Each structure stands twice: as C-alpha cells, then as structure tokens.
Amino acid sequence: MISILQRVKQARVEIDGQVAGSIGPGLLALVCAERGDTEAEADKLLAKMLKLRIFADDAGKMNRSVQDLDGQGACGGLLIVSQFTLAADTGGGNRPSFTRAAPPAEGERLYDYIVQRARALHPEVATGRFGADMQVHLLNDGPVTIPLSIAPATAA
C-alpha cells in the first residue's frame, strides 16, 4: 500500500460541493492499494501513519505523532482520502499507467478496511468517498510531506 502523508493545520474533502470530511490540525493521508495488498499491508501502513513522529515537540523537533500532538495526549485529526493515482507508472512515456493499482473492488475493500481500523484506533477520523471525484483542500503545515510504502508480502 502507498500513502502520501501531509501534516496540515486543517484539511477537508468535498464531493459535489458538499464537505464529506474535515479535520483541524493533523494528517491528510492519500491512500492507494496496490495489486497483491492485503489487510496485513493496510495494518502496517496505518500503524506507521499513527506512530510517525512528524509533529514538533516543545523544542521544535519532530518528536510527536498524530496521536500526541501536544505532549499531553491530545490527538490530531486523520483525513483519509483514496487516490489510485499514487500507483502511477510514469516510466513508459508521457501517459501514466495505473496497472500497479489494485482492481477497483479490491481497492475499495482495502480502503474501507483501513478506514474501519483507523476509526477503531484513533478518535478523530474523516474520509472522502472511494471512487468519487473529490476536491481536497488543505493548509499544509511546514510543509511536511512524507511518502510511505508497504510492499505486498508476495513482492518481498
């Protein structure tokens, strides 16, 4: 599975002009399932998202995770948005290929799984809608943008 994490002051996703999900300070996670991904890769990716220390501590060092923004246990928001284009292969010309992305039904199943697990593990989770034409608005913090990739076990 692939994710691009962006540390944000705020973010929201709109579908057909309506806000589908929004957060204050926290992480915007663009997520893509690849062929061969399973719940195991989704679990590893989510664990990394929640534990990655990319928020500043009192000394200004990246020492806090989205689960502990202020050092006192206050959690930030997690906005999860599906984006199959993260699996783009741009090596064969000027038109990207998306054959590395999971088939739509499998991608949706794994997206729903990671959202369900995130809601079980984190108090503030918002989402877009799989397959929808979405507009994502964010106020990037830093900016801090981190790519994450968990290879399918079959590819190891």
Curated annotation (Swiss-Prot):
Name a single GO biological process. D-amino acid catabolic process
Name the GO cellular-component terms.
Answer: cytoplasm
Q: Kindly indicate whether the keyword Hydrolase belongs to this entry.
A: yes
What keywords sit in the KW lines? Cytoplasm, Hydrolase, RNA-binding, tRNA-binding
UniProt-listed Enzyme Commission number(s): 3.1.1.96
What is the reaction catalyzed? glycyl-tRNA(Ala) + H2O = tRNA(Ala) + glycine + H(+); a D-aminoacyl-tRNA + H2O = a tRNA + a D-alpha-amino acid + H(+)
Which SUPFAM superfamilies does the UniProt entry name for this protein?
DTD-like (SSF69500)
Q: Name one Pfam family in it.
A: Tyr_Deacylase
Where does it localize?
Cytoplasm
List the Gene Ontology MF annotations in alphabetical order: D-tyrosyl-tRNA(Tyr) deacylase activity; Gly-tRNA(Ala) deacylase activity; Ser(Gly)-tRNA(Ala) hydrolase activity; tRNA binding
Renumbered to this chain, motif Gly-cisPro motif, important for rejection of L-amino acids spans: 142-143
Q: Which Gene3D superfamilies match?
A: D-tyrosyl-tRNA(Tyr) deacylase (3.50.80.10)
Q: What is known of its domains?
A: A Gly-cisPro motif from one monomer fits into the active site of the other monomer to allow specific chiral rejection of L-amino acids.
Q: Which family does it belong to?
A: Belongs to the DTD family.
Free-text function comment from the UniProt entry: An aminoacyl-tRNA editing enzyme that deacylates mischarged D-aminoacyl-tRNAs. Also deacylates mischarged glycyl-tRNA(Ala), protecting cells against glycine mischarging by AlaRS. Acts via tRNA-based rather than protein-based catalysis; rejects L-amino acids rather than detecting D-amino acids in the active site. By recycling D-aminoacyl-tRNA to D-amino acids and free tRNA molecules, this enzyme counteracts the toxicity associated with the formation of D-aminoacyl-tRNA entities in vivo and helps enforce protein L-homochirality.
Read off the NCBIfam families from this record: D-aminoacyl-tRNA deacylase (TIGR00256)
Relate the assembly described in the record: Homodimer.
Instruction: List the PANTHER family.
Output: D-AMINOACYL-TRNA DEACYLASE 1 (PTHR10472:SF5), D-TYROSYL-TRNA TYR DEACYLASE (PTHR10472)
What is this protein's name? D-aminoacyl-tRNA deacylase
